[in-house]
Each structure stands twice: as C-alpha cells, then as structure tokens.
C-alpha cells in the first residue's frame, strides 16, 4: 500500500514538472508597437495583449520599436517569419499616411502585411487654449476667419495625423493656420495648455485629460457620435459640418503569407477580448473605443478605405516631411 502511494505521488510530481516545462517552453507572441511606451498605441496594445493572452493561454509580449515615423517597427514585422509569433499594432501613420509622405519606404504597406483584426479607435478632438476667448465652435470660427496673422496650430509633427487633420479642417472650415510642429503630442498639448499656441487637433488619449480638467477648451469631436467621458462636447456633425469624421485607429497585422488558420485564431481571440466589459472600460478610460467585430477581410477593407481617403488628400495639401 505504501509502495502504491509512493509511486502515485512520484507520478504526480513528474506530471506537474512536465506541465511546467511545457508552459515554460511555449514561445510567446509579440505585439510590436511603433511608438514609445506610454502612448496610445502602447496602452491599447498592452490592454488587448493581456486579455488575449488569457484567451489563447499563451504569453503575449509588447515590444516598443519606435523611430522613423513608425517605419522601424513596421519593417521588423514585415521581415518576421509568418509563423503567428509576431504581429504589428498598426496605426494611421505606418499603415497608411507614410505611403503618401515618403517616396521610399523599407516595406510595402499594401503587400507586406496581412490584416488580422481591428483593435481600437479614437476621435480627433478640436480644442484651443483656455484664454483664447471662445467657448464653442461658432465663436472660434468668427475669430479664426478674420484673424491676421493666422492662429497658431500645434501638431505632433509634420505629416502626423494631427498635422494633416488640422490642415484639412482649416481648409474645409475656411480659416488659415500657422503650423507649429512639436516632437509628439505630449509637448504639443503642454504648449497649448500653457497658452503658447492657439489650437490643436489631437486624439483623445493625449488630449482628454487637459480638456476635462479645464486646462484647454474642447470645441468639437471629429466623430459621428459623442464620447461618453466627454459627453458635453458636440460632434462636428452637430455643429453643421458633414463628412468630417476623422479617427486615429489601430489594427493588428501579421507578416504577409501568414497562414489563414493562424490569422483566424488571433482574430477570434482578439474579437472575444474586445467584448469583455473590463477591457471596454479600460479602453474607454484612456480615450479609445474598441474597434470590435472585424473579420480579416473587413480589416483589410477598412485600411483600404483609409488609404483611398488620405493619400489624395496628402498630395492635395502638399504635406511633406522635412
């Protein structure tokens, strides 16, 4: 009896050791973020990775590979093996805008990746310094259209979505701006809150806190519906401007030639994660909305539509990086 108990105990130890070794030998999945830690892309990636890892029972590591307008990180994914272990958290810039800004790129945005699934979106917020003397869009336009010299407009950098959005909106609304580029949204928003520039268009993750705290004055959301944490801010559509919805977005992409079963497995896991109330609350807490329910084909169509919209506009506005 004692011998039987001994061997059962020993077998249990061996099985546990084998399971632990198997878990340790699981190769983690990598989500590559093309911007530094702490930004919207990084936060979205980490929130989604945590939930998706639990669903897949596989660790997911978030790696930040910033530089060259997101092209360093994107190129690393384009060159990765299509084995389901490396994915790109792709945003407007590396996935679409750079194609209209740079004549030479280390990867082909249209051929180097396989779209997998949507992740999150954030509407652009139009906001001004608090001592500009306006409290709504109507008052702002009355001031901006007659201002000479033009109002100063901050952006996160030349060719950035914040820059292109601002130039586009100014042209459609009938006012001019003096563009002041910064090296990222954080210093640009800080300059606006400090009264050093007049105006900015920025995604909610980097602009919402200042708007809610009263350091800046939010005028309008560039979306088709209001955002719950800023429910008092009207949309541009409510203010009389149709078809001006502009969002900053993130999608998940795999290297080209990634097998369809791998793509579908990740698609289903991420879409399931995006339905969980805890994730939705965390995503909304940073100023994003889940971009849930997309099939790989729908993700590809979404990117293609964004490309058709923005590339001609970049050429029309004549925006080029320095």
Residue ranges and their predicted role:
Residues 1-11:
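Bacterial N-terminal signal peptides that target proteins for export
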Residues 18-20:
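N-terminal signal peptide c-region/cleavage motif recognized by signal peptidases
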Residues 23-111, 150-152, 162, 172-199, ...:
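N-terminal (or domain-start) structured segment
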Residues 26-28, 260-322:
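An extracytoplasmic/periplasmic, membrane-proximal ligand-sensing/linker region
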Residues 79-85, 100-187, 236, 249-282:
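Hinge/capping helix and adjacent helix->loop/strand transition within the periplasmic-binding protein
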Residues 89-94, 98, 185, 202-207, ...:
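Beta->alpha turn/N-cap motifs
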Residues 121, 135, 207-275, 305-308, ...:
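C-terminal lobe and pocket-closing loops
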């Amino acid at each position: 009896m004692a011998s039987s108990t001994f061997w059962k105990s020993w077998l249990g130890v061996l099985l546990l050791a084998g399971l632990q070794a198997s878990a340790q030998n699981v190769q983690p999945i990598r989500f590559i973020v093309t911007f530094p830690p702490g930004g919207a892309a990084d936060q979205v990636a980490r929130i989604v990775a945590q939930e998706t890892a639990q669903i897949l029972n596989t660790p997911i590591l978030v790696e930040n590979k910033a530089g060259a307008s997101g092209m360093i990180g994107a190129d690393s994914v384009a060159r990765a093996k299509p084995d389901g272990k490396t994915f790109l958290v792709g945003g407007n810039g590396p996935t679409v805008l750079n194609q209209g800004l740079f004549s030479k790129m280390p990867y082909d945005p249209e051929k180097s990746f396989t779209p997998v699934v949507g992740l999150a979106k954030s509407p652009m917020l139009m906001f001004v310094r608090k001592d500009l003397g306006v409290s709504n869009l109507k008052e702002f336009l009355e001031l901006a259209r007659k201002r000479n010299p033009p109002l100063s407009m901050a952006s996160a950098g030349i060719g950035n979505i914040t820059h292109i959005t601002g130039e586009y909106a100014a042209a459609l609304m009938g006012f001019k701006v003096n563009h002041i580029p910064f090296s990222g949204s954080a210093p640009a928003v800080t300059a606006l809150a400090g009264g050093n520039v007049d105006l900015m268009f920025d995604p909610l993750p980097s602009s919402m806190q200042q708007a809610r705290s009263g350091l800046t004055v939010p005028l309008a959301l560039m979306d088709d519906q209001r955002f719950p944490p800023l429910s008092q801010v009207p949309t541009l559509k409510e203010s009389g401007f149709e078809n001006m919805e502009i969002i900053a977005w993130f999608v998940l992409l795999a290297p080209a030639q990634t097998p369809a079963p791998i793509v579908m497995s990740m698609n289903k896991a991420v879409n399931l994660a995006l339905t969980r109330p805890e994730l939705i609350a965390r995503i909304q807490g940073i100023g994003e909305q889940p971009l849930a329910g997309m099939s790989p084909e729908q993700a590809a169509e979404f990117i293609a539509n964004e490309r058709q919209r923005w590339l001609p506009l970049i050429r029309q506005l004549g925006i080029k990086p320095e």
